[in-house]
C-alpha cells in the first residue's frame, strides 16, 4: 500500500504493523519520525535486546540486510530490522543483489518487520519499491510547501498542548523556513521555558529563538512597509554590523518573498482574502499583513 507519512504514523501508533516499509523522500524530519515510531512500537521494550536491530547503510550491504531479515526472532512474536540511510548500502546498484532483495520482499517473513529508510527520493521507475508497496508499505516523505507550513506549525504546537499566536507562527516560518526539524526543535525548546498555561507569542519567539526584539528582519520589513525611513536605516545598520546572526542572503530572501507577494497583490483584481491566499500561495492567516503593505 502507498501511504502518506501522517497516514503511516497513525497506523504504526495503532500497532497496525506491516512486514515491509520502504521510506524515502527529501524531508528527513518525517523519515526520522517514522523510524522512531517503529522502534518504539514494533518490539516490546523487554525484547528489544535480542529482536531489534538498527543498521546503517554504509555498514550493511544487501546480503547483511537479508541475513538479518531471514532470521527468526528470539522467543518473541517478531523482530525489527531497521536500515537507516539505506541509499548507502552496497549492492543496491547490482541487478543480482537487487533481485535477491525483491525476492525476499515478494515473500517476506511474517515474523520480521524490515524497514528501509532512504534519504532522498528513490527512482520510482525501478521495481524494488513496487514490490515493497505490493506486500508492505511505500511512504514518500515530501518537502512541505511553504503555504502549508503555518497550519502545520500551529498543529504541531497544539499537539503538544500549547497555544501559539499567528504572529509567532509567522516569525518561526519566515525566520526558519521549511526546516521541520529545526522548527520542532525550537518549539520544543520554547515549551521547556513556559508554563502549561502560557502562550507562545511573538515576544516568546524573539526571546528563545534568538531573534533580536527591535533589530531583526521582520522589524525591518515592518518599518519599510510603514515608510519609517529612520527606523529602517537603524535596523539595516544593525543587521549589517552583525552578519553572523543576520546572514545577508537570509535577510534578502525574507524581504524578497514578502515584497514580491505585495507586488502580486497590486496586479490582482480580486483582492478578497480567500482569493489572495490562493494566488499568493500562503495561509489566509497572513493575507492581512500583505494587504496592509500593498
Model-inferred region functions:
Residues 1-294:
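Conserved beta/loop motifs at nucleotide-recognition and modification sites
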Amino acid at each position: 500500500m502507498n501511504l502518506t507519512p501522517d497516514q503511516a504514523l497513525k497506523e504504526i501508533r495503532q500497532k497496525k504493523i506491516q512486514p515491509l516499509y520502504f521510506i524515502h523522500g527529501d524531508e528527513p524530519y518525517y523519515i526520522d519520525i517514522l523510524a522512531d515510531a517503529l522502534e518504539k512500537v514494533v518490539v516490546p521494550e523487554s525484547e528489544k535486546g535480542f529482536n531489534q536491530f538498527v543498521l546503517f547503510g554504509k555498514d550493511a550491504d544487501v546480503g547483511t540486510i537479508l541475513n538479518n531479515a531471514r532470521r527468526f526472532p528470539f522467543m518473541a512474536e517478531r523482530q525489527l530490522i531497521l536500515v537507516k540511510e539505506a541509499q548507502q548500502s552496497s549492492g543496491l546498484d547490482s541487478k543480482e543483489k537487487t533481485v535477491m532483495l525483491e525476492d525476499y520482499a515478494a515473500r517476506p517473513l511474517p515474523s520480521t518487520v524490515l524497514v528501509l529508510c532512504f534519504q532522498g527520493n528513490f527512482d520510482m521507475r525501478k521495481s524494488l519499491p513496487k514490490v515493497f508497496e505490493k506486500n508492505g508499505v511505500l511512504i514518500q516523505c515530501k518537502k512541505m510547501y511553504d503555504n502549508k507550513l503555518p497550519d502545520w506549525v500551529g498543529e504541531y504546537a497544539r499537539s503538544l498542548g500549547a497555544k501559539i499566536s499567528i504572529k509567532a507562527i509567522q516569525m518561526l516560518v519566515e525566520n526558519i523556513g521549511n526546516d521541520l526539524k529545526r522548527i520542532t526543535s525550537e518549539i520544543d525548546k520554547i515549551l521547556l521555558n513556559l508554563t502549561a498555561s502560557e502562550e507562545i507569542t511573538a515576544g516568546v519567539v524573539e526571546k528563545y529563538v534568538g531573534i533580536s526584539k527591535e533589530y531583526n528582519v521582520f522589524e525591518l520589513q515592518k518599518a519599510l512597509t510603514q515608510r519609517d525611513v529612520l527606523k529602517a536605516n537603524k535596523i539595516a545598520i544593525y543587521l549589517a554590523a552583525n552578519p553572523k546572526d543576520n546572514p545577508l542572503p537570509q535577510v534578502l530572501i525574507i524581504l524578497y518573498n514578502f515584497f514580491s507577494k505585495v507586488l502580486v497583490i497590486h496586479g490582482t483584481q480580486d483582492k478578497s482574502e480567500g482569493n489572495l491566499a490562493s494566488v499568493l500561495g500562503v495561509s489566509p492567516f497572513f493575507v492581512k499583513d500583505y494587504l496592509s503593505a500593498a
